Amino acid sequence: MLLRLWVFVLLTPCYGWRPLNISNSSHCRNGNFENPIVRPGFITFNFYTKNDTRIYQVPKCLLGSDITYHLFDAINTTESLTNYEKRVTRFYEPPMNDILRLSPVPSVKQFNLDRSIQPQVVYSLNMYPSQGIYYVRVVEVRQMQYDNVSCKLPNSLKELIFPVQVRCAKITRYVGEDIYTHFFTPDFMILYIQNPAGDLTMMYGNTTSINFKAPYKKSSFIFKQTLTDDLLLIVEKDVIDVQYRFISDATFVDETLNDVDEVEALLLKFNNLGIQTLLRGDCKKPNYAGIPQMMFLYGIVHFSYSTKNTGPMPVLRVLKTHENLLSIDSFVNRCVNVSEGTLQYPKMKEFLKYEPSDYSYITKNKSISVSTLLTYLATAYESNVTISKYKWTDIANTLQNIYEKHMFFTNLTFSDRETLFMLAEIANIIPTDERMQRHMQLLIGNLCNPVEIVSWARMLTADRAPNLENIYSPCASPVRRDVTNSFLKTVLTYASLDRYRSDMMEMLSVYRPPNMERVAAIQCLSPSEPAASLTLPNVTFVISPSYVIKGVSLTITTTIVATSIIITAIPLNSTCVSTNYKYAGQDLLVLRNISSQTCEFCQSVVMEYDDIDGPLQYIYIKNIDELKTLTDPNNNLLVPNTRTHYLLLAKNGSVFEMSEVGIDIDQVSIILVIIYILIAIIALFGLYRLIRLC
């Protein structure tokens, strides 16, 4: 075994390191290889081969610094020549003719501001007004939060590169047996994939601080280049074609790097990839071959977002772009389990301080729900934020407007779906008072009905949804777990769309929260229970095919044997107790008349069910006008027949059958009734006098 010691010529002068006390010094005057000279101020290296001897002398001052110790600690001075030769040829070297020097061309408008514009400081953010629009400099708000300590890069890189002292943000995910780790630094991004078949490291950015150990050269690992950055690929030859096929087809990588300087184009690219992944049913599959490709694009998106496009941009556009970034974070977290780390942009948190009186800095368009947008941005911080009551009021109004627009079975627009996606995320993540939480879940869940299911299916089949937000459906609400495979089959079969049922179930499995911990009244329910939960202000109704929760229950008896409907009422402050038996019962009441004066049945829900198909839809009634619209025979919204029936689930926990008599609301005021009675009395009195005269 030959002893091989690699000598590194350090070009930095001695005074570049910490001061050293040199006890002696000497000029380097070598003899010949037969008579080497040993000097006190030098370290002498003698290298012997078969027919040659080489002598190197290095001044001790170059080897006395901390960094030198780190460098020598990073190399193996006892490695055999045989192992060394094997190591040299083990790694994949990209073909030189494929290393294109890509020239990214920004595809969107770049904003330039007059340099004389003085900023207005709003909550520590510099705002630049120009022609009625406020701008911020992207570099000031998109700074990623890096750890305070030096980053520990993957152990597999120790063989190839010297230690790098740099701060970074790190996030790790598990997919089956694979582990995906992203490292983000101000200069470069690393995606490290650990796989039983072999690891892969992709490093993109300004890699001038990355120094490879002999015999490796950085140029041997360059896979692609742009004008400013390199993409390094470190993977063994025997692994690349078996495990990481997307690298062999470099089209995806080339297209990604072509857009690397344009964040919005990258976000659009990821949205398209995410939607394709959903529609193929590949999300959450541990053997999905496209996960490495998705993780690479995810890393490029965040790296470019935090380092590119540093100039001015309208505030609203900055916020909408960050909204889209959070939506892909949400999607990836649903598809791939996060085990460690998070990515934060602390300056964006400053926008959460804005109240409705400050919204003119963001937009003057009153139709945009700024409160919803800002509160959605807070989902990245979970419980570490406080949302003001003014924002919650604004959010409640936004949701109420969408509900009133579509409560009577009209198709949701893309804009509505995007807003509902944000509202659902807010309801499922941001802590709020129980009243608000229940109200949001109720309205979002009640927008799921057969019309919405058919509309959603047609939208998915047409592949028209442009991003991962407006592909959302309220049927993914955690309170609508009754939307099961069999329920979708029932609805889609009537519309001849049953062939798309599996796609919709995949979407629901991704977008529906795994539990109901935010709703105290039903948090004990198993996620596998096919139950609908109606969280009214003072009572919660759970509609299920069996007994699942402690409460006052009612069994519907008009259905066929194969269809079972059990309605359980749980008072507001009751403790959630899961059960499989009847705890207490109540009778079904018959509703004969509804007064238009007191609106006893406002804040209640009208439920439609079929004797064969079971529960179909629910409509929350807020006020008397909505009740009149719903029950007006001319609107054909309630059409009872021998199979279809309607129940009114009242705010006090009672359940009423709505007969045809009950559907006709008494809309006559008490004053008119008195007038009619007086007229009738006068008429009768006149008739009496007429008879007497005869």
From Swiss-Prot:
Intravirion topological intervals: 693-694
Glycosylation sites: N21, N24, N51, N76, N148, N206, N337, N365, N384, N411, N538, N573, N593, N652
One Gene Ontology cellular component: viral envelope
Record keyword NAD present: no
Localization, UniProt: Virion membrane; Host cell membrane; Host endosome membrane
Record note on modification: N-glycosylated, O-glycosylated, and sialylated.
A biological-process GO annotation: symbiont entry into host cell
Keyword check for Transmembrane helix: yes
Ranges where the record places region Interaction with gL: 174-234
InterPro entries, per database record: Herpes_gH (IPR003493), Herpes_glycoH_C (IPR035305), Herpes_glycoH_C_sf (IPR038172)
Alphabetical keyword list: Fusion of virus membrane with host cell membrane, Fusion of virus membrane with host membrane, Glycoprotein, Host cell membrane, Host endosome, Host membrane, Membrane, Sialic acid, Signal, Transmembrane, Transmembrane helix, Viral envelope protein, Viral penetration into host cytoplasm, Virion, Virus entry into host cell
Residues annotated as transmembrane: 672-692
Membrane protein topology class: Single-pass type I membrane protein
Signal sequence range: 1-16
UniProt main location, coarse: virion
Virion surface compartment segments: 17-671
Record-linked Gene3D superfamilies: Herpesvirus glycoprotein H, C-terminal domain
Subunit organization: Interacts with glycoprotein L (gL); this interaction is necessary for the correct processing and cell surface expression of gH. The heterodimer gH/gL seems to interact with gB trimers during fusion.
Family label: Belongs to the herpesviridae glycoprotein H family.
Function: The heterodimer glycoprotein H-glycoprotein L is required for the fusion of viral and plasma membranes leading to virus entry into the host cell. Following initial binding to host receptor, membrane fusion is mediated by the fusion machinery composed of gB and the heterodimer gH/gL. May also be involved in the fusion between the virion envelope and the outer nuclear membrane during virion morphogenesis.
Protein name, entry field: Envelope glycoprotein H
Native organism: Human herpesvirus 6A (strain Uganda-1102) (HHV-6 variant A)
Gene: gH
